[in-house]
Regions:
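Amphipathic alpha-helical hairpins
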Residues: 1-199
Length: 199
């Protein structure tokens, strides 16, 4: 989010820039989530991602309502932050070997996105409140609640299913101990020497 530009001279400027930022973010997520859904092999994870795709599409529509309430046309501002997070997620998935490890990587990538969104929505709500834009706060708060709920569901799936499956596979394959048993030669014990008592 490129906040430090000459065009941003007031809190209202910051708010509108942030709104365009999150609008871009949500649209990028709509484009990227199908790849995660296709790659996921855990049934619960796939189901949760599909549900969140529908939520994200609805979040885009809510943001368009926010623009409309503010008398502006919906438009996005390219966000290097989310571009970097999504690229890192793609690279992580491309380098992961094994179905269960892939599911864990998907959760990690998805939660990185969720945490970014949660931060952005929290900031926008605070700015909207300060600027007296109360009419848009409920829409932003609804999006924030959904992001927090999605993050919580991802954590639950990871703890109950995905991470356990990945760790079990690691123990069976790549998680073997690298310590070698050292064979030691038997220690020869010296027989005690009988000493004569001095008479």
């Amino acid at each position: 989010m490129g906040l430090f530009t000459r065009d941003l001279q007031s809190l209202d400027d910051l708010f509108m820039h942030g709104l365009k930022d999150i609008y871009y973010v949500e649209n990028q997520i709509v484009k990227n989530l199908p790849k995660m859904i296709e790659a996921a092999t855990d049934a619960e994870l796939k189901k949760g991602l599909k549900q969140h795709l529908g939520e994200t599409e609805e979040q885009v529509r809510r943001l368009e309502q926010v623009f409309e309430l503010l008398g502006d046309d919906p438009q996005g501002t390219r966000c290097p932050g989310i571009d970097g997070i999504l690229k890192e997620g793609d690279e992580l998935l491309a380098n992961v070997d094994g179905r269960k490890a892939t599911n864990a990587a998907i959760v990690a990538a998805a939660q990185a996105v969720e945490h970014y969104e949660i931060t952005r929505y929290g900031t926008l709500i605070a700015w909207a409140t300060e600027l007296g834009k109360e009419e848009v706060v409920p829409l932003l708060e609804r999006n924030l609640r959904e992001e927090k709920a999605a993050d919580k569901k991802l954590s639950a799936v990871a703890e109950a299913r995905v991470n356990k499956g990945s760790s079990r596979r690691a123990r069976k394959t790549g998680g073997r101990s690298t310590k070698r048993k050292v064979s030691r030669a038997p220690v020869k014990r010296k027989r005690p020497v009988a000493r004569r008592c001095a008479s």
